[in-house]
Amino acid sequence: MVSAWCSIALALLLALHEGKGQAAATLEQPASAPKGRGPHLRFRRCSCNSWLDKECVYFCHLDIIWVNTAGQTAPYGLGNPPRRRRRSLPKRCECSTAGDSACATFCHRRHWPEAVVAPSSQAPAAVLKTGKMWTAEGDLLRKLRDISATKLRFARLQPEVTRKAIPAYSRWRKR
């Protein structure tokens, strides 16, 4: 009886050993193929100045997994750029290749609403026109001052609203 158990155990051991050898041989073939490719690299079109600018992160990082969480949409798979570089760049982002015109347009533009000094007969809401870009900081300040002056001119031309005089005493007695 002992010899029967020994022969069954030996047969089982040989069967398991052969099966393990076949599985190891099949696993080694795919494992050798990725070694030639190297590590997975994330493709970036540009590098954002701020991670809080979701539009920039979505535009620049082409290989990102976006996960919807309860409060916000969070990007995963991003690295953290050096703070020195983020502080030194006044622009929105920095392009990886200088020849990418779409990236240069996205990263280096500034959208500010352009204010036009309107005649004093127009309402201040009619003064603003959007869609043009400014390049100099002084233009924004000048345009904001023009808007303020237009609002003041418009307010002076409006007829004053007459208010009813409120009596100093109340008709109703408090009890």
UniProtKB/Swiss-Prot annotation:
One of its GO terms (molecular function) is hormone activity. Residues 93-108 are annotated as: Endothelin-like. Disulfide bonds join 46-60, 48-56. InterPro entries: Endothelin, Endothelin_toxin_CS, Endothln-like_toxin. Vasoconstrictor. The lineage of its organism: Eukaryota, Metazoa, Chordata, Craniata, Vertebrata. The record marks 66-67 as: Cleavage. The keyword Secreted applies. This is Endothelin-2. Residues 1-21 form the signal peptide. Coiled coil: none annotated. Keywords: Cleavage on pair of basic residues, Disulfide bond, Secreted, Signal, Vasoactive, Vasoconstrictor. GO terms for biological process: angiogenesis; artery smooth muscle contraction; axon extension; cell tip growth; cytokine-mediated signaling pathway; endothelial cell migration; energy homeostasis; lung alveolus development. GO terms for cellular component: extracellular space. Residues 22-43, 67-175 form a propeptide. It holds the Pfam family Endothelin. It is found in: Secreted. SMART domains: END. Belongs to the endothelin/sarafotoxin family.
